[in-house]
């Protein structure tokens, strides 16, 4: 059964709701709201790989986000990266 991945901006919204200590890491989350798919280009600049770079940047800077929701969402984001 093939399922369609959730839009990245939807995942970002769930992160915003769950990560209580987001604070200084917000800069790594904000770009995720621009994208639906991992293959999306930057909406303003049009460069390819923008969504992938944003997801990689977020994952690299989200080690302090813990818990079951964090684990599931990080797995989901890694799954998006592996699809491409």
Residue ranges with predicted function:
Residues 1-6, 78-84:
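Short intrinsically disordered terminal tails
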Residues 3-26:
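N-terminal acidic leader/helix
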Residues 12, 29-32, 52-55, 70, ...:
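Generic L/I/V-rich hydrophobic alpha-helical segments across diverse proteins
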Residues 23-24, 28-31, 84:
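Sequence termini and other peripheral, non-core segments
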Residues 38-64:
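Acidic, low-complexity, intrinsically disordered interaction modules
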Residues 61-83:
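Short, compact, well-ordered microdomains
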